């Protein structure tokens, strides 16, 4: 809450919360509790490997939905809008630890990563991925009163899509010239999900390299 007070002091009226990344998942999703209950911790017996810090002890944490409602209310009194970011389609290594089915269909080279699977991006060719993300984004949209939900779009390792036979077949079928167009398709599907729940997308600028998204997209 101290950070929110500092934002108010400096008349900054937006707080973007980066709630997911390769390293952790920090928001409770009731339809998929494993995301935070497992993905919010690392070390010890956790399947999430620590990048820094303790290896022998389990540590971490996440925001419950009640926690987040308290933060949103505290910020609103100070005229600050809280915008959540669910970073997609890349930066999903943590989520893939619990849901490996989201990944592209090829055998990763683990020898360069000490046995650790470094695939970190959703496979845009898998229809089931959009069903999973619909579950997640529905709860995010219901929880946050903001008009905008940030859906990421940055730093996607597209070499994974180039190696994926499903992605390549999907691109050929749909006349896509490159993987940036495949990312545009993925982000457009998420935009449709958000629109269904009355929200607009915010993205990083890399998300529009494959072409224009919806007119109401906020680009950072």
Which residues make up each language-model segment?
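Generic structural signal for well-ordered alpha-helices
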Residues: 4, 68-72, 86, 133-141, ...
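Catalytic-core regions of glycoside hydrolase
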Residues: 154, 158, 165-220
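Active-site beta-loop-alpha junctions enriched in small/polar residues
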Residues: 20-24, 87-91, 154-156, 206-208
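Aromatic- and acidic-residue-enriched carbohydrate-binding clefts of CAZyme catalytic domains
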Residues: 23-77, 92-131, 159-180, 184
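Active-site groove signature of glycoside hydrolases
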Residues: 87-88, 107, 114, 118, ...
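Short, well-ordered coil/turn segments that N-cap beta-strands
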Residues: 11-13, 76-80, 145-149, 195-200, ...
